[in-house]
């Protein structure tokens, strides 16, 4: 019931000006950040999350909404609730390290919210980097973790470089294939700067993230060529083809436009996130929609993530590095633009 009520509003929420607006049959309504935060927090506590975990999870979701990334914000909340309803999300997980060295670790998320597990694991990577220069953490037995950028940006608070990867539900066909064998498998790299804002690169390894297709499906929109293919393997602009057996395409769209490079990037994310940790990989990654049956075979545990933190002082003087990053960003931002 909670999921059903919230889905209608959350699936259409977006950021406008200083508040959030959602559309309904009676027109537009604006609610504040705090109102939305309190509502989402109450829903997560209702399913059994502690106040601390609920607040963290909502903070991760709203960090997407305030950046205009509607596909990864509170629109996802109903999906998490439905996964809890079918016992695929543990609201009170016992997150723990199952293997570690001074610079590496494997974390078991105990089927908890990825929104909670990911920051926990990233903090482990940061602590290791603080001790020995770099920290690398692979995670098993987790779930969808929201935007990768939130977790990687935690490193900025320590003047470190942050990295976050995750595998995802198999919706992507490798180059030349008609089978959905990989997820959108995003990569995020965050680099601190000096005077200016940091470098934050957060992207799917597909031409478009699944959330973008979901938005087009709700609006009956048209997808650009190179985003998806139908179940016969032909390029399509109909976003509903994805639900009819089609697939998302690797970054590049097709071989002629470099999709093999996107295929490689997505594969690397899958290997680092899952095979390195003992999570499920490839076509065996658990689907995000609760109504989609779980794969019959489960070679690993849950969804996998991978996090990294690098202490700049382990490579060179931090102030000199930041000065160079500022110069680099200035150079790129002041390039001559196309006419």
Predicted regions and their residues:
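Catalytic-core signal marking the mid-to-C-terminal active-site face
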Residues: 27-31, 36, 271, 280-339
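Active-site cofactor/substrate anionic-group-binding motifs, chiefly glycine-
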Residues: 73-126
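A generic, well-ordered mixed alpha/beta core segment in the N-terminal half of proteins
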Residues: 105-194
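N-terminal glycine-rich anion-binding loops that anchor highly charged ligand groups
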Residues: 29-32, 49-75, 89-100, 297-302
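Phosphate/diphosphate-binding glycine-rich loops and adjacent basic-rich segments that engage nucleotide
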Residues: 172-242
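Secondary-shell segments that build the walls of catalytic and ion/ligand-binding clefts
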Residues: 221-284, 288
């Amino acid at each position: 019931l909670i999921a059903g009520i919230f889905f209608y509003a959350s699936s259409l929420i977006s950021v406008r000006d200083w508040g959030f607006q959602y559309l309904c049959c009676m027109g537009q309504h604006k609610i504040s950040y705090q109102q939305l935060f309190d509502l989402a927090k109450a829903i997560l506590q209702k399913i059994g999350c502690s106040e601390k975990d609920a607040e963290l999870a909502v903070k991760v979701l709203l960090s997407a909404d305030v950046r205009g990334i509607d596909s990864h914000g509170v629109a996802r909340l109903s999906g998490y609730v439905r996964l809890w309803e079918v016992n695929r999300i543990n609201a009170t997980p016992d997150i723990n390290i199952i293997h570690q060295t001074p610079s590496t670790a494997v974390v078991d998320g105990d089927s908890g919210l990825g929104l909670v597990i990911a920051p926990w694991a990233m903090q482990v990577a940061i602590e290791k980097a603080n001790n020995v220069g770099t920290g690398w953490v692979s995670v098993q037995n987790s779930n969808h973790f929201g935007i990768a950028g939130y977790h990687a940006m935690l490193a900025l608070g320590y003047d470190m470089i942050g990295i976050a990867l995750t595998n995802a539900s198999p919706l992507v066909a490798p180059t030349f294939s008609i089978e959905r064998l990989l997820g959108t498998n995003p990569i995020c790299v965050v680099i601190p700067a000096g005077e200016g804002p940091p470098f934050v690169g957060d992207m799917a390894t597909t031409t478009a993230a699944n959330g973008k297709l979901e938005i087009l499906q709700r609006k009956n929109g048209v997808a650009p060529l190179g985003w998806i293919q139908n179940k016969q393997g032909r390029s399509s602009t109909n976003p509903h083809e994805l639900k009819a057996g089609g697939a998302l395409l690797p970054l590049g769209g097709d071989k002629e436009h470099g999709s093999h490079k996107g295929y490689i990037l997505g594969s690397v994310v899958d290997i680092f996130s899952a095979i390195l940790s003992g999570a499920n990989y490839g076509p065996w990654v658990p689907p995000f929609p609760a109504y989609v049956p779980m794969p019959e075979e489960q070679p690993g545990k849950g969804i996998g993530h991978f996090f990294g933190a690098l202490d700049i002082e382990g490579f060179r003087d931090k102030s000199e590095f930041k000065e160079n990053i500022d110069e680099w960003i200035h150079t790129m931002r002041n390039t001559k633009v196309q006419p």
